[in-house]
Amino acid sequence: VIVLDTSAVVAILGDEPDAAELTDRATLALATVMSAGTALELSIVVLSKWGPDGLVHLDALLRELRTTVRPVDEAQVRAGTEAYRCYGRGSGHPARLNFGDCFAYALARSLGAPLFFKGDDFVHTDIAPAHPA
């Protein structure tokens, strides 16, 4: 199982240059999971970029990737709080995680699962990537 971050899903939906490669990597996973917090962040980003049609494409992609949305529990709240303390914007750390990033980090930490993301924020944390950096 791998944990999805908003960044990778937006790259796929936005047909960025590496979208096909990201899709291939994600579909190789037996299953994908996403924090409810990430799901909300992702839906808001998709809605603002592509409108209601974007949400239709998002739902189809998440079905294709066999994605399960997991509720945020107390352990994730603690892990997300610690992530923001150590790696958040304003901490001085190069990861500069934002609020939404902390949901993905917390779920990956609580499951001991790798995180599927795009960009250079999570590479500066202690979370294992689900793909080569």
Predicted regions mapped to residue ranges:
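Active-site neighborhoods of divalent-metal-dependent phosphate/nucleic-acid chemistry enzymes
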Residues: 68-114
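Acidic, PIN/NYN-like endoribonuclease modules and their adjacent C-terminal/linker elements
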Residues: 105-133
